[in-house]
Amino acid sequence: MNPILSSLFALSLLSSLSPSTHAHQCHFPAIFNFGDSNSDTGGLSAAFGQAGPPHGSSFFGSPAGRYCDGRLVIDFIAESLGLPYLSAFLDSVGSNFSHGANFATAGSPIRALNSTLRQSGFSPFSLDVQFVQFYNFHNRSQTVRSRGGVYKTMLPESDSFSKALYTFDIGQNDLTAGYFANKTVEQVETEVPEIISQFMNAIKNIYGQGGRYFWIHNTGPIGCLAYVIERFPNKASDFDSHGCVSPLNHLAQQFNHALKQAVIELRSSLSEAAITYVDVYSLKHELFVHAQGHGFKGSLVSCCGHGGKYNYNKGIGCGMKKIVKGKEVYIGKPCDEPDKAVVWDGVHFTQAANKFIFDKIAPGLSKACKRQ
């Protein structure tokens, strides 16, 4: 059955969307991305040190700034649009911004958390900071590009900013930060309106800078991720039949409902904007619930990690090594078949899972420039 897209082009698992044919009705000369580790292509690595091996091993052959064994959804989006992979704004080495820039960094929240990376594990590059980075990039890039030469080939053309696709995948860390701070799910729920308000303000600010095409992912089922499940003891009654923590998934759904409603309102106020709300929650949840039916061997267990029910240990992360009998060996080692795993390291999805998600949402890219 053909999918029926709402005025927001909301994409869900219930729509039987076929994989991308790479034939797009929309032409985007650039992508500007904002978010967290779900779409970070090297921002946090540039700021605080490279994510080491075995990250990147399934595709790049070496670490590539991504907390994944290979490509992220944003990489597949770039590929499908015929664009190069996005360089991280924070990465000064080997970057090319002619077709956009990536302002996402792992651990980034929408709201500033007023803590350091070492204190909380969350990035200081919140969404408002990412917007300031974009604002400065937008203005300075054209000044520098006017010098000609190599600058002209490494920076976007001025009209790329109004024709670009602006992508967002952020919000997960705002929810988990509250939970990790010993707040109840109910307490975190009361913060959702303010979180969404700040999210919408960022979009309005980008619109004010000429952005017109927005592609917004909702947040995933955090109650199915080992780093959240293992953080605190949960009552048996909190788990659903698939092993996920129901109250936390409900929290994510509450966030998504508020986000969708805010986008509906925003479309009426930003008359020239085309805003696509993308339901990745349903797709990710489908992978956790019916992993084997989609060619995966497991769902909750991490591919890369160490010990425990979920092959996850906060103190022994993916890629961690130690000296054994004079030799350096992996303790947080990867599984033999990452292409059969849903979760890479207890926090992030594998390249195979990202490809599954992308294939389902890809048809919406051909409509992401359409206003209704």
Swiss-Prot record:
It comes from the Eukaryota. Its EC number is 3.2.1.51. Glycans are attached at N96, N114, N139, N182. Gene3D superfamilies: SGNH hydrolase. It catalyses: an alpha-L-fucoside + H2O = L-fucose + an alcohol. One of its GO terms (cellular component) is apoplast. Residues 1-23 form the signal peptide. It is found in: Secreted, Extracellular space, Apoplast. The active site is at S37, D345, H348. Its main location: secreted. Belongs to the 'GDSL' lipolytic enzyme family. Hydrolyzes alpha-1,2-linked fucose. Also active on fucosylated xyloglucan oligosaccharides. This is Alpha-L-fucosidase 3. It comes from Arabidopsis thaliana. The gene is FXG1.
